[in-house]
Amino acid sequence: MRIWPQTWAALLDVDLIEVGRKRPLVGVLGALRMLPDIVSHLLHGELPPRPPEHLRLRDLATIPLDKGGWVLLGLREQDEIALGLVGKFWRPVIDFASVRSAQEFVDFSEPGFAKTIYALSVRELGPRRTLLSGVMRTATTDEQARRWFRRYWTFGVGSGAHLLVHGLLDVTREMAEERAAQHAT
């Protein structure tokens, strides 16, 4: 990847909805993950919530927690962003914990939950060269949650998560390279 400032801007601007459109498999996986929530609403006589038109990485920490919003754990401008999410991800309709700050994320220990950190970074490798990387880590709050999460991750979800992360990084790279090309002209 080229041009570090454009890469950072592209990372924050990447639209997860657009990633699903540009990478059909990512879109299908996202739709499959949302399906149980939609069915649950319909079974309760409710209309499912409208999906957002855009879902940019920079906005994830502004989404309500019960809607899958992430907590901003740390931000080093032009360098790295870390987001956290606490929930029972293995359930068809995810039960999200109400964690509103980085400190609450660190302190959260209620049994039966998993805590995920998603860190994305941009590193300048030299003139016109940039490394964009993403790391996702999950820890559970107790042994039972660990068993549930391990089953969930092992039976295909882990592979799907890797496809989602790769799609996000790939679309970010494309955006950064396009911006760099526009900047050069």
Language model segments and positions:
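A conserved amphipathic terminal alpha-helix motif
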Residues: F149-A184
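Short, solvent-exposed loop/turn segments at secondary-structure junctions
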Residues: L16, G87-W90, R137-A139
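Short, hydrophobic/aromatic alpha-helical segments in well-folded domains
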Residues: A10, Y118-S121, L168
